[in-house]
UniProtKB/Swiss-Prot annotation:
Cross-referenced PANTHER family: MYOSIN (PTHR13140), MYOSIN-52 (PTHR13140:SF841)
UniProt organism field: Schizosaccharomyces pombe (strain 972 / ATCC 24843)
Main location: cytoplasm
Segments forming domain Dilute: 1163-1431
Start and end residues of each IQ domain: 793-813, 818-838, 840-865, 866-886, 888-917
Annotated ranges, domain Myosin N-terminal SH3-like: 7-62
Protein name: Myosin-52
Family in the record: Belongs to the TRAFAC class myosin-kinesin ATPase superfamily. Myosin family.
Underlying gene: myo52
Length: 1516
């Protein structure tokens, strides 16, 4: 039998000496009569039996019962723990700390556990943006959440705020305060620059920089290294950040409390003096050190070497000194004043080195001591006077004064008092100067502070082996703050109970008012201390004796305890623990002053800074009534009384503000990163009051649930018939059945439970779930086994049917096989017999054929022999007849040859006689050769001229048609010009232009007539030449037969003559073309003159502006036409006409040497385009399609690049000036930069449009609209479905794709655009999982589904590499879908290269588990944390976004053709039209000249080829 809240299997905590608490479980719980036995088993399987009364089982932790373990051990808020007890709180903090989560809420308190490692990624400006304008519960616990909460409360409630940061030394208070101040400064800059990029740090104002500059100053002069902390604040400070009515920072004010002055003259082992001294020695120049008589080695100074620690690991004192000097300048302290400050600090180091000797019983200081001289020279005082008043004291007796020598100890105390006095004065002066600078900023801006947010960075509770006056004051301040904290928590509890309408009674809690009254009352400890200080013969022992007499009464037994051994110690029972104080030095530290003589000495210092510093100190410490009496020392306040009054003022300020609490925890004494010491943390939780706060909460209603949360957790405790969608009714039904009405109360929005109710509900929930699981198992088992039976029966029957069929088929097959075998046997026998018959028959036939063949061959052989005999006989007879014929033929030929020889000899004799006639034959030969040469030359010339005339005729006919069209265009333009002149009444310059145009027309007509005449003449000459050619051919044929013997020589001479005649023909052709070129040059000069006038006219600029505006109005229509494939309209509106026209104008300017004007023109185009693009984006209905401007700008860039390359490879480029070269390059760079700006604006607009869609479309929705939310509320309520889906994102991407297709945007730009958009989707969706949303298994499937949708779109749209930008999302989806309790989980996630371990751990930490899911084991989280530390803790959680740039290829498009450019008809741009027409005409003329030049070049080339064809062996 079980009873109460304890039952078998319940998780609990078991006390342990080393770890405080270890996890365990209840093995058995039984009640036997008047006793209850609880068997508890720890994690090592050690069992313990606890015997209690049965009634004790209803109360957690009573009479040795174990505390219960919470289900959610890593809750963000400790008050959300299922069981609010000390071990659960400790376990929650330890679990989060091991998961690298250093911040945890505990109700209104933020607990910050020091990681002892820099975490810069936790405080970036992206994190500032994330927490800005968010409520505290929306995001993970953070310093910025507390800061934002205070900022929001100040704006909404119009009430001043205070953030109280407390904790012991080394807990991280200073760093926390620093980051809070940085947050306020950064969030102000963020609000004032809402359009800044998400990943760019906001720009701070001068006031905000000054406020942030106070941190390095105060840390340098007020912080030091201690055994517990490398940067321990040795003073308390309260910084008020002032805001005006618009919640804008206008200034600040700093208040300090109790500077530890004794640290200046003494430091314990391994501790340092204040940072500023080490910074001066490390950061000052050699000249400065020489000036101040210092050396770099700090061990040379008595005030710096006592702690045997001169450096801090990881801290560069030289760099810190530079930062301190810069901060001093930021707050308005000039270089001269800085020199004075450092000179004073150097003097203090020299004072510490002044050696005090003893002479008998008196102290002695050598007046020639080097350190004394250095100190007095820097302080501007007389060395002998300083020595006098350090070794003697003046005792006033009535009207006289007596000088009393001091002993060595007293002189050292006097020396150290001077140093402490001067340093404390300097510190207070710095604070006042900083306040004056910060308030000056507010006065200068003529603004009044309406509210403030105070940041209190004050020392935490301290307890050392030896506790002195400083620890007493610090603990006194913590008593006051703790009391205020208790009241604040109690007040919030009361306010919440009242707001919810609960019936509640007074909650009893520990009040430390008695301890505070004992310290600060009229007859309290501080008053008795001040009284003892005023006594002539005072001592610490006398003071302790008075304390014992006053507080040894019974009413102070809970606050005070006297020492058992003498009057040197006393004990105060503080709220945290009892502290034993050593009374030695209390009186001297409380007085904290120097003699009047020393004050007068420094008041009369020769150094103005030292003098002003002492006077400032006297004014600050003197009572108000005596402030004017400076030369005589007034009755000054003691340090204890001043601290008490400042503390009372501080508490009054805090009471008037809304307080926010941050408790800093030091996790271990060794300052080792990520080490959690349970015992040390528990002691601090007790000291800072967190556990006491939990006790206060437990005394009332420690557990509270909203209706929806309660129903979603415990809906299974009532039958389904009782369930309703109204959560309040549903909650009441659950409570009536399972809870005692006295143990809970129902408020307006929440249900409040007393201690012990939650375990009962959890027990009932476990039972209900087990019962439901049992029912489900029964139903599943019945269904499972019935299904198995039916399936088995079906399979048996199927097997039987198969077996029957198999046997039947087998019998049938046997019968068929037997029948077939018989048939086969008969067929086989038949085949054998047939085979034997065929073989016999074939043998007989073969024998017969052999015999017949033998007989036939024998007959054939006899016939062959007979025929051969006849052939041999005929061949022999033939041979004999042929031989006789050859003999007769030989003799006949011989006779003929002899006769011919005789005739030849006779003819030779005749030729010798005629040899005298040779000269005559040569002359005839020469005339024939000359005639042949002339005929050959005329033939070649005729052929060449004929070819040239044919080409010229074709060319002139083409030009004739072009000139006709040009004439019509000129006449229309001339008519327009006349109308323009008549309408605008222009001056004589336009008339002259008109006359020139008319003359040009007349010249063109004259040239056309000449061309026609030339054409007729050419036709006539061609006919004549053809007839002559025929005659020449006949002559050549006749004379060729007469000159065959000398053909080789004649051919060579003819070739040489042809080469000379060809050169003469080319010269004549060039002379004929010269006149045509002169005429063309004249016309070109007139065209250039008119072009120059138009390019210099301002009307061109206005035309370009009109054209830009026209493009802006009509490009969306163009895209619509292009998408509809309307070819006719699309051809009318060329989407690149703007770029082409602008390039033509730029080209004409370059030709006219107007390079600077072209730069101005391009700049004008860029400015107007950007104005249009940026201004029009404010209207959603008229959103510009930037694809048009991107396409035109890229086309213009391509045209300019092509022209630039053409210039570089032409001779004209070398003729341009250096300024022209620079102008061309400037235009290219300007257009390239302009293209980049438009591209980035395009990306920005698309991203802004997608931003509100991404989270819902990528994470919350997936395969169905309800897919994203794992919240169990969906089981009982219907919420509004997500607004956006992935189809909405695809719709935006389709628009971008259509725009790029419509305007034919360059592929590289299109690729970069899509990749940038995908990168933005990836970054926004991924970062939302670390800020606003939580991951879950279902959301992992949603992300995976949406990823593949976007991937498919990429593949379809021609950018297959864009989906690689979503790699982080893809791997995130896999992590969310992995089984969380997999023992190899860490090994599996190592393959995710796109994510670091910090991101993986954060995803798991923020994972929203469903009821059926197993949680990630602590071992896995610890292993992930170890990997994070091993790889470096400074990993980034969130991704940063950058627009991906495009990579333009070097191969651009070629320059546009003028024939393809058409200005829209409805665009009134007169000047621009005329420029295009002139450029078109110029291009036509240039093309014609190029054609004529090519013809002449071809002629020269042909002649050259003929020269090279001279036969071998002939010399020309």
């Amino acid at each position: 039998m079980t009873s109460g809240i304890y039952y078998k299997g319940l998780q609990c905590w078991i006390p342990d000496e080393q770890s405080q608490w270890i996890p365990g479980s209840i093995k058995d719980c039984r009640v036997e009569g008047e006793k209850a036995f609880l068997t508890v088993q720890d994690e090592n399987e050690n069992e313990t039996v606890i015997t209690v009364k049965p009634d004790d089982l209803n109360y957690e932790g009573r009479n040795g019962l174990p505390f219960l373990r919470s289900i959610n051990s890593d809750a963000d808020d400790l008050t959300d723990l299922s069981y609010l007890n000390e071990p659960s709180v400790l376990d929650a903090l330890s679990t989060r700390y091991n998961q690298l989560q250093i911040y945890t809420y505990s109700g209104i308190v933020l607990i910050a556990v020091n990681p002892f490692q820099r975490l810069p990624n936790l405080y970036t400006h992206e994190i500032v943006r994330a927490y800005s304008e968010k409520s505290r519960d929306e995001l993970d616990p953070h310093l910025y959440a507390i800061a934002e909460d205070s900022y929001k409360c100040m704006n909404q409630e119009h009430k001043n705020q205070t953030i109280i940061i407390s904790g012991e030394s080394g807990a991280g208070k200073t760093v926390s305060a620093r980051y809070i101040m940085r947050y306020f400064a950064s969030v102000q800059a963020l609000i004032q620059s809402t359009d800044s990029n998400f990943h760019e740090a906001p720009q701070l104002t001068a006031v905000e920089n000054e406020i942030l500059a106070t941190n390095p100053i105060m840390e340098a002069f007020g912080n030091s290294k201690t055994s517990r902390n490398d940067n321990s604040s040795r003073f308390g400070k309260y910084i008020q950040i002032l805001f005006d009515g618009n919640a804008t920072i206008i200034g600040a004010k700093i208040q300090t409390y109790l500077l530890e002055r004794s640290r200046l003259v003494f430091q314990p082992n391994q501790e340092r003096n204040y940072h500023i001294f080490y910074q001066i020695l490390a950061g000052s120049s050699s000249e400065q050190l020489e000036k101040w008589k210092l050396v770099e080695n700090s061990q040379e100074f008595n005030y710096l070497k006592q702690g045997n620690c001169s450096t801090i690991e990881g801290v560069n004192d030289k760099e810190e000194f530079k930062a301190t000097v810069d901060a001093l300048k930021t707050v308005g302290i000039d270089n001269d004043t800085c020199e004075c400050i450092f000179s004073l600090l150097a003097a203090l180091l020299h004072i510490g080195n002044i050696e005090v000797k003893h002479s008998r019983n008196d102290a002695y200081i050598d007046s020639k001591n080097e350190n004394l001289i250095n100190a007095t020279s820097l302080l501007g005082v007389d060395p002998s006077s300083l020595v006098k008043w350090l070794t003697k004291r003046k005792i006033k007796m009535a009207s006289e004064g007596i000088l009393k020598p001091l002993n060595e100890f007293q002189a050292v105390v006097a020396r150290d008092s001077v140093a402490k006095f001067l340093y404390a004065s300097l510190f207070d002066w710095l604070v006042a100067t900083i306040n004056k600078a910060l308030m000056y900023s507010a006065d200068k801006s003529n603004q009044t502070a309406k509210s403030f947010i105070g940041v209190l960075d004050i020392y935490g509770f301290e307890h050392f082996k030896k506790n002195s006056f400083e620890q007493f004051c610090i603990n006194y301040a913590n008593e006051k703050l703790q009391q205020e904290f208790y009241r604040h928590v109690f007040k919030l509890e009361q306010e919440e109970y009242a707001a919810e309408g609960l019936n509640w009674s007074y909650i009893d809690y520990q009040d430390n008012q008695q301890c505070i009254s004992m310290i600060e009352s009229r007859l309290g400890i501080l008053s008795l201390l001040d009284e003892e200080c005023r006594m002539p013969t005072n001592s610490d022992e006398n003071w302790v004796s008075k304390l014992n007499d006053a507080f040894s009464k019974p009413e102070f037994k809970n606050s005070y305890q006297k020492s058992r051994f003498g009057n040197k110690e006393f004990t105060i029972k503080h709220y945290a623990l009892d502290v034993v104080y050593c009374a030695e030095g209390f009186i001297d530290k409380n007085r904290d002053t120097i003699s009047d003589e020393l004050l007068e000495l420094f008041t009369n210092s020769d150094v103005p800074f030292v003098k002003d510093l002492v006077l400032f100190r006297l004014e600050q410490t003197a009572p108000p009534a005596d402030t004017k009496k400076i030369k005589t020392k007034p009755k000054s306040n003691t340090l204890g009384s001043m601290f008490k009054s400042s503390l009372v003022s501080l508490m009054s300020t805090i009471n008037e503000t809304n307080a926010h609490y941050i408790r800093c925890i030091k996790p271990n004494e060794e300052k080792e990163a990520w080490k959690f010491d349970n015992q040390m943390v528990v002691s601090q939780l007790r000291a800072c009051g967190v556990l006491e706060t939990i006790k206060i909460s437990c005394a009332g209603f420690p557990s509270r649930w909203t209706f929806d949360e309660f129903v979603s957790r415990y809906y299974m405790l009532v039958p389904s018939a009782v369930r309703t969608t109204e959560s309040l009714t549903f909650s009441k039904a659950i409570l009536e059945k399972h809870a005692d009405p006295t143990k809970y109360q129902i408020g307006k929005t929440k249900i409040f439970f007393r201690s012990g109710v939650t375990p009962l509900l959890e027990s009932a929930r476990d039972k209900a779930l087990k019962h439901a699981a049992h029912l489900l198992y029964e139903a599943f088992a019945v269904n499972y086994y019935r299904t198995r039976f039916l399936l088995s029966r079906k399979r048996v029957r199927s097997f039987q049917a198969v077996a029957h069929g198999f046997l039947s088929r087998r019998h049938t097959e046997y019968e068929l096989l037997s029948s077939n075998i018989i048939k086969l046997q008969s067929l086989w026998r038949t085949a054998l017999k047939r085979k034997e018959f065929i073989q016999t028959k074939n043998s007989i036939l073969k024998v017969q054929s052999i015999i017949r063949g033998f007989l036939l061959r024998q007959t054939l052989e006899e016939k062959t022999k007979h025929d051969a005999t006849l052939i041999i006989q005929s061949l022999w007879l033939t041979f004999k007849a042929h031989k006789h014929y050859k003999e007769l033929q030989y003799y006949a030929v011989r006779i003929q040859s002899l006769w011919r020889m005789k005739l030849a000899k006779r003819q030779l004799t005749e030729l010798k006689i005629e040899s005298t006639k040779a000269s005559h034959l040569k002359q005839v030969s020469y005339r024939l050769e000359s005639r042949l040469f002339e005929i050959s030359k005329q033939l070649d010339n005729s052929e060449q001229e004929n070819n040239k005339f044919r080409e010229r005729i074709a060319e002139l006919e083409s030009h004739l048609s072009n000139y006709a069209e040009a004439k019509l265009a000129q006449e229309r333009e001339l008519e327009q010009t006349r109308v323009l002149i008549s309408d605008q009444s222009q001056d004589g310059e336009l008339k002259e232009l008109l006359e020139e145009k008319e003359n040009a027309l007349i010249m063109m007509e004259e040239e056309m007539r000449q061309v026609n005449d030339a054409n007729t003449e050419l036709l006539r000459v061609n006919a004549t030449l053809k007839s002559q050619l025929k005659n020449y051919d006949m002559i050549i044929v006749e004379q060729t037969s007469q000159l065959k013997e000398k053909n080789r020589i004649i051919a060579s001479l003819t070739k040489a003559t042809k080469i000379l005649n060809s050169a003469s023909s080319i010269e004549q052709s060039r002379n004929s073309e010269e006149k045509s070129r002169r005429d063309s040059s004249l016309m070109e000069m007139r065209t250039q003159k008119e072009m120059l006038v138009l390019l210099m006219n301002d009307g061109l600029k206005h035309d370009l502006d009109k054209l830009t505006e026209y493009a802006g109005r009509t490009f969306t229509t163009l895209k619509t036409l292009l998408l509809k494939d309307n070819d006719v309209e699309a051809q009318k509106l060329d989407h690149l006409f703007l770029a082409k026209l602008l390039f033509i104008i730029i080209s004409q300017m370059w030709k006219s040497n107007l390079c600077q004007e072209s730069v101005a023109l391009v700049e004008r185009y860029c400015v107007h385009t950007l104005e249009y693009v940026f201004q029009k984006t404010s209207s959603a209905n008229e959103r510009p399609d930037i694809g048009f401007w991107v396409a035109n700008t890229h086309a213009l860039l391509a045209f300019v690049y092509t022209k630039q390359q053409a210039f570089k490879h032409s001779s004209a480029f070398t003729l341009l000036s250096t300024e022209s070269h620079e102008s061309v390059q400037t235009i290219f760079e300007m257009i390239e930069s302009h293209l980049s700006k438009i591209f980035f604006e395009w990306v920005r607009q698309v991203n802004n449009f997608l931003k509100p869609l991404i989270v819902q479309a990528m994470i919350i929705t997936g395969t169905n609209t309800d897919a994203g939310d794992e919240n169990r509320k969906l089981r009982i309520k219907f919420f509004e479905k997500p607004k956006y889906k992935i189809t909405d994102v695809i719709h935006v991407l389709n628009k971008v794709h259509d725009s790029c297709q419509a305007y034919k945007v360059n592929y590289e730009i299109y690729n970069a655009l899509i990749r940038s958009i995908y990168r933005f989707i990836n970054v926004e969706a991924f970062n939302s999982l670390f800020i606003d949303e939580r991951g879950s298994w279902k959301r992992g499937t949603n992300i995976s589904y949406n990823y593949h949708v976007l991937k498919d779109w990429c593949l379809e749209s021609g950018v297959p590499e864009a989906y690689l930008q979503l790699e982080e999302l893809l791997q995130t989806s896999k992590i969310l879908q992995f089984v969380k309790d997999d023992p190899n989980y860490v090994a599996r996630v190592r393959d995710f290269y796109a994510l670091n371990f910090l991101q993986i751990k954060t995803l798991l930490h923020r994972y929203d588990y469903a009821d059926y899911e197993a949680h990630v084991p602590k071992k896995t989280m610890s292993e992930l944390s170890k990997n994070i530390v091993a790889e470096g803790i400074n990993q980034r959680e969130q991704l940063t976004y950058e627009v991906l740039d495009y990579r333009l290829q070097d191969s651009f498009e070629e320059s546009p053709s003028l024939e393809k450019i058409k200005i829209p008809d409805d665009c009134n741009v007169t000047y621009l039209r005329r420029i295009i027409d002139l450029a078109s005409a110029e291009e036509s003329v240039e093309q014609a000249l190029i054609t004529v030049g090519n013809v002449a070049d071809n002629d020269v080339q042909n002649s050259s080829d003929e020269e090279n064809q001279v036969p071998n062996g002939i010399k020309v």
